[in-house]
UniProtKB/Swiss-Prot annotation:
Entry-linked InterPro entries: CALM/Myosin/TropC-like, EF-hand-dom_pair, EF_hand_dom
Summary of the function given for this chain in its UniProt record: Regulatory light chain of myosin. Does not bind calcium.
Protein's name in the database: Myosin light chain 3
Region (Disordered): 1-37
CDD domains in the record: EFh
In-chain residues carrying the UniProt-annotated modification N,N,N-trimethylalanine: 2
Keyword terms, alphabetized: Cardiomyopathy, Disease variant, Methylation, Motor protein, Muscle protein, Myosin, Phosphoprotein, Repeat
Residues the record lists as Phosphotyrosine modifications: 130
Protein species of origin: Homo sapiens (Human)
Domain of life: Eukaryota
Ranges of residues in domain EF-hand: 49-86, 128-163, 163-195
Subunit organization: Myosin is a hexamer of 2 heavy chains and 4 light chains.
Length: 195
């Protein structure tokens, strides 16, 4: 005679199998840390000749009635760019202490306040190379023939990242499209980087 199988308990039959606990969501990737700007900790490493040159450029932007050697917060990015830097608007706002929109045209700064900002921006450049820009545009090259659609590039420039105005996009793209509305992106990047 075969051994008797134990009969299952009635409670066990009614118990539903326990669901496994939901897996924990994957941890979010750590955001890159912003380089904090503290003007008091910035060591000025420019030569006296460079500082004099920067001062002359700074004075060109001074719109005060008595030439007080001051610019508005809103002009800071323009002066930085005139001095060969290429900060994003977000970087400019960060070194300015993230002022409110209305403060950009009313708050003023003198050259001594500006100089540490220039030093910080020039040391923390994250300038893309020609290859970086070409690689970024290659994503939009659907045919693999070295071109992107002009309309698509216009859309990207106006809606992604540091957005450009319609006028800025038109100036940038003037004379770049071929008869099919395509743009050779390698030539486009060369054009932009030489401007």
């Amino acid at each position: 005679m075969a051994p008797k199988k134990p009969e299952p308990k009635k409670d066990d039959a009614k118990a539903a199998p326990k669901a496994a606990p939901a897996p924990a969501p994957p941890p979010e990737p750590e955001r890159p840390k912003e380089v904090e700007f503290d003007a008091s900790k910035i060591k000025i490493e420019f030569t006296p000749e460079q500082i004099e040159e920067f001062k002359e450029a700074f004075m060109l932007f001074d719109r005060t009635p008595k030439c007080e050697m001051k610019i508005t917060y809103g002009q800071c990015g323009d002066v930085l760019r005139a001095l060969g830097q290429n900060p994003t608007q977000a970087e400019v706002l960060r070194v300015l202490g993230k002022p409110r929109q209305e403060e950009l045209n009313t708050k003023m700064m003198d050259f001594e306040t500006f100089l540490p900002m220039l030093q910080h921006i020039s040391k923390n450049k994250d300038t893309g190379t020609y290859e970086d820009f070409v690689e970024g545009l290659r994503v939009f090259d659907k045919e693999g023939n070295g071109t992107v659609m002009g309309a698509e590039l216009r859309h990207v420039l106006a809606t992604l990242g540091e957005r450009l105005t319609e006028d800025e996009v038109e100036k940038l793209m003037a004379g770049q499209e071929d008869s099919n509305g395509c743009i050779n992106y390698e030539a486009f990047v060369k054009h932009i980087m030489s401007s």
